Amino acid sequence: MSAVKPLEAVARDRVGKGAARAVRRQGRVPAVIYGGGQSPQSISLDANQTHHLIYGGGFLSTVFEIAVDGRTIRAIPRDYQLDPVKDTPLHVDFLRVVSGQTIEVEVPVHFVNQDAAPGLKQKSGTLNVVLHTITLAVSPDAIPDAVNVDLTGKDIGDTVHVSDLVLPTGASLALAPSETVATLVPPTKLGADVEAEEAAVAEAARAGSAAEAAKEG
């Protein structure tokens, strides 16, 4: 389960493009907390910390305890905007987390026990991943860091479907059970195979050159 993370914020009285630009000049990122049947709360966040949180992974599936004006607001990021040139954060939207509420979050899919998959370990097959993330409808208190797929015993030609995933208690998926998560496919020509093929081509070229030289002689 993802841990709730603390996050310091400063309340903003002014909103709009001009106010947002002024906030960014101060090394901060404008943000808003909305939902939960309450009025939106405009805040600003430290720009460096926000950058690290976004690029650290799992940002949109992490619940934060946001400290502002002497109180804390539990919220989860719903969206963020980046500068198209610098890739720095421009704005963040947070959704208030309400007790008993179910929310949709996107979490990564991790593939475990690959060494125990004969199709990968013994037969040098390739894991063709179709879904790197999945969207869960889950309680904010039960958001997992990832959904693990156990590859033990999987062979070439096997397929992992959405129905094979083990989900947290109370969580559900917005995908069809038959949808493909990953497949194990046969190995392709790599490494030694490519080198052997190149050597054969070079040998054929040398033989051809020798034959031409013999004709001219």
Curated annotation (Swiss-Prot):
Q: Which GO terms describe its biological process?
A: translation
Q: Which InterPro entries match?
A: Rbsml_bL25/Gln-tRNA_synth_N, Ribosomal_bL25/Gln-tRNA_synth, Ribosomal_bL25_b-dom, Ribosomal_bL25_C, Ribosomal_bL25_long, Ribosomal_L25_dom, Ribosomal_uL5_bac-type
Q: Does the keyword rRNA-binding apply?
A: yes
Source species, domain of life: Bacteria
Q: Which Pfam families match?
A: Ribosomal_L25p, Ribosomal_TL5_C
Molecular function via GO: 5S rRNA binding; structural constituent of ribosome
Q: Which GO terms describe its cellular component?
A: cytosolic large ribosomal subunit
Name the UniProt key words of this record, in alphabetical order: Ribonucleoprotein, Ribosomal protein, RNA-binding, rRNA-binding
Q: Does the keyword Methyltransferase apply?
A: no
Role of this protein: This is one of the proteins that binds to the 5S RNA in the ribosome where it forms part of the central protuberance.
Q: Which family does it belong to?
A: Belongs to the bacterial ribosomal protein bL25 family. CTC subfamily.
Matches recorded under HAMAP family: Ribosomal_bL25_CTC
Known partners and oligomeric status? Part of the 50S ribosomal subunit; part of the 5S rRNA/L5/L18/L25 subcomplex. Contacts the 5S rRNA. Binds to the 5S rRNA independently of L5 and L18.
Quote the protein name from its UniProt record.
Large ribosomal subunit protein bL25
Q: Which gene encodes it?
A: rplY
